[in-house]
């Protein structure tokens, strides 16, 4: 495996057609880790409720992954940024630590809310953690995800929001992992989901506090 990102069968980045600025940013980030030519741009599904658009976009990718019989698929959001000096080394060591673990979700970064559980030196067992800016789905979770969201037209309750569902349901029932140290966060910029400028510095601070 020349590049640790070869661990992932396919890599997608969700990007709204009108956010050319975000796509240019994302390509620069992908170029840093040698995957610019591998990342497939997924035209984000636009909804008045951006949270619903994120769900439908992820659902579209997961359905593609199942159709293509991919063992796993890595999904980025277009505001992702690599926050460590050696992301390829971090990812490589974390993947080595996975070994034969039957994981379902594998995060490169997350908004953590609890003290983090290190199951190996470079691997965290993730619980009660949010955000979906850089996350891989394993094939064992495709059907669970599709069953939850297929045909969704609106969000009826808070627990239907994508990262809330993953944190409260999937992370509680399945093996969900994150690299250690966390290697991605999100840039501070205008969010089409939140409809305002968002500062994501708190994600990095929470990780520092929760990994102690």
List the predicted regions and their residue ranges.
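An acidic/histidine-cluster motif and surrounding catalytic segment
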Residues: 1-76, 80-212
């Amino acid at each position: 495996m020349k590049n640790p990102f070869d661990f992932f069968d396919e890599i997608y980045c969700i990007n709204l057609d009108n956010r050319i600025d975000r796509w240019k940013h994302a390509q620069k980030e992908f170029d840093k880790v040698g995957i610019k030519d591998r990342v497939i741009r997924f035209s984000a599904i636009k909804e008045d409720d951006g949270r619903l658009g994120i769900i439908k976009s992820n659902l579209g990718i997961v359905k593609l992954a199942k159709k293509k019989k991919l063992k796993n698929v890595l999904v980025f959001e277009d505001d992702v940024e690599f926050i460590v000096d050696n992301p390829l080394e971090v990812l490589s060591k974390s993947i080595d630590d996975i070994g034969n673990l039957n994981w379902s979700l594998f995060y490169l970064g997350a908004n953590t809310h609890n003290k983090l559980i290190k199951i190996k030196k470079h691997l965290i067992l993730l619980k009660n953690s949010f955000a979906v800016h850089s996350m891989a789905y394993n094939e064992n979770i495709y059907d669970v995800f599709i069953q939850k969201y297929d045909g969704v037209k609106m969000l009826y309750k808070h627990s239907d929001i994508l990262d809330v569902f993953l944190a409260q349901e999937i992370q509680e029932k399945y093996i969900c992992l994150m690299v250690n140290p966390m290697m991605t966060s999100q840039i501070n910029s205008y969010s089409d989901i939140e409809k305002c400028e968002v500062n994501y510095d708190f994600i990095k601070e929470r990780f520092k506090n929760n990994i102690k």
